[in-house]
């Protein structure tokens, strides 16, 4: 059983108890009248038990060489945890480029002065409108020619006799084939 008779044991100091429990530890240093003497400064390499408040070759505090990198890493980790990452993903980059392209085309298509800058002497207004329509068809209004084409009935519904001609494929390149672009 582990119960000892407490009356037979004499009172021992904490240092004795610790040295008994941890026999591999070095002997405790002698205390100076119970006063606290550690200055939290590194001791000199020649004398590891220096009790002087200032060591002879004391150097002022300097940050470690990699402390800036370490702090930057911690800040990046904190931003990532908060969802404020500063790293640009490919999706964000593509979205940004797409938005810039859209804004640039909007300025080109809707700003008359900018459009005139790209015009040469022989570049007429209809060619510019055609170019704009080719670049961004959903943003340019249809012209009278296109409206007329959309409102006219198709060739197939005009005459039943012509439908037999359109059913056979065009064999030669010189022969005109009906197409929606014409």
From Swiss-Prot:
Cited function: Regulates clathrin-mediated endocytsois of cargos such as transferrin probably through the association and modulation of adaptor protein complex 2 (AP-2). Has a role in ciliogenesis and is required for proper cephalic and left/right axis development.
Subcellular location: Membrane, Coated pit
Protein name in the entry: Coiled-coil domain-containing protein 32
Major location category of this protein: membrane
Keyword Membrane: yes
The organism's place on the tree of life at top rank: Eukaryota
Bias kind Acidic residues: ranges: 172-182
Free-text disruption phenotype from the record: Depletion of ccdc32 using CRISPR-Cas9-mediated gene editing results in disrupted cardiac looping in embryos at 2 dpf, reduced number and length of cilia in Kupffer's vesicle, and in a significant reduction of head size at 3 dpf. Furthermore, ccdc32 crispants exhibit significant alterations in facial skeletal morphology and have hypoplastic cerebella.
Alphabetized UniProt keyword annotations: Cilium biogenesis/degradation, Coated pit, Membrane
Subunit structure of this chain's protein: Associates with adaptor protein complex 2 (AP-2).
Species this chain originates from: Danio rerio
GO terms (BP aspect): cilium organization; head development; regulation of clathrin-dependent endocytosis
This protein's GO CC annotations: clathrin-coated pit
UniProt keyword Membrane present: yes
Chain intervals with Polar residues compositional bias: 153-167
Spans through the membrane: none
Compositional bias annotation for Basic and acidic residues: 1-10
């Amino acid at each position: 059983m582990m119960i000892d008779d407490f009356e037979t044991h004499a009172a021992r100091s904490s240092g004795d108890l610790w040295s008994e429990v941890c026999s591999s530890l070095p002997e405790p240093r002698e205390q100076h009248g119970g006063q606290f003497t550690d200055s939290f400064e590194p001791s000199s390499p020649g004398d590891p038990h220096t009790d002087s408040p200032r060591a002879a070759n004391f150097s002022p505090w300097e940050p470690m060489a990699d402390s800036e990198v370490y702090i930057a890493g911690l800040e990046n980790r904190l931003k990532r945890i908060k969802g404020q990452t500063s790293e640009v993903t490919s999706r964000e980059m593509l979205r940004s480029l797409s938005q810039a392209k859209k804004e640039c085309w909007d300025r080109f298509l809707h700003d008359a002065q900018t459009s005139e800058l790209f015009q040469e002497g022989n570049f007429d207004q209809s060619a510019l409108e055609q170019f704009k329509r080719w670049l961004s068809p959903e943003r340019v209004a249809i012209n009278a020619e296109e409206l007329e084409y959309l409102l006219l009935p198709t060739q197939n519904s005009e005459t039943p006799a012509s439908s037999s001609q359109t059913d056979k494929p065009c064999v030669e390149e010189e022969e005109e084939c009906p197409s929606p672009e014409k």
